[in-house]
Amino acid sequence: WTERKIEDPESISEHTYSAWLLAMLFLPEEQETEGYSKREILDMLLVHDMAEAIVGDQTISLCEPTKELKSQNEVLKKLFLKGTYPDIANLTHYYNVWTGYYNGININARTARDINLIQTVYTFCEYYCIYPDHFPAEDIRKWLSEKNNLKTDIGYQLFDRLITQNKEFAAVFGALQPEKKDLHRE
């Protein structure tokens, strides 16, 4: 966000809490999908960027978070090892939750990653509506195409509900309208 000269950009804490809040408000308590646990998803979102507090916010491709996650994993291993010291809470549960997010192998991890992506695209849309001249059209296409990287049905539903169908983001989609008209002429 700083590259686009956004004044007072979202902090890591604000991003984490916003993602957590999206999940709290919009995810169902139960789902027929085997292994689904809203609590585990919420825990994953609570710790998913914990290492960024130490290593800093990193610019990554949302569809290929592997490098960022690997770097964070090393930091978190050290942090959670401190839970083995006397008089320090055992953080093994949260390390296991983060490892689940890192590996992305179950429905909860995939849902948490989808929520993380949706929250980030939502933030882009908010910033675009405030600072439209800070973003080229290619940014709009790039951010909106992140929908293709979602992994869960609930992720697609929430993306549509919170972004695509959000009337407050009409400016984002309107910025692409002239291009669409040109494409129809060809």
Regions flagged by a language model, labelled:
Residues 1-186:
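Alpha-helical, largely C-terminal catalytic domains
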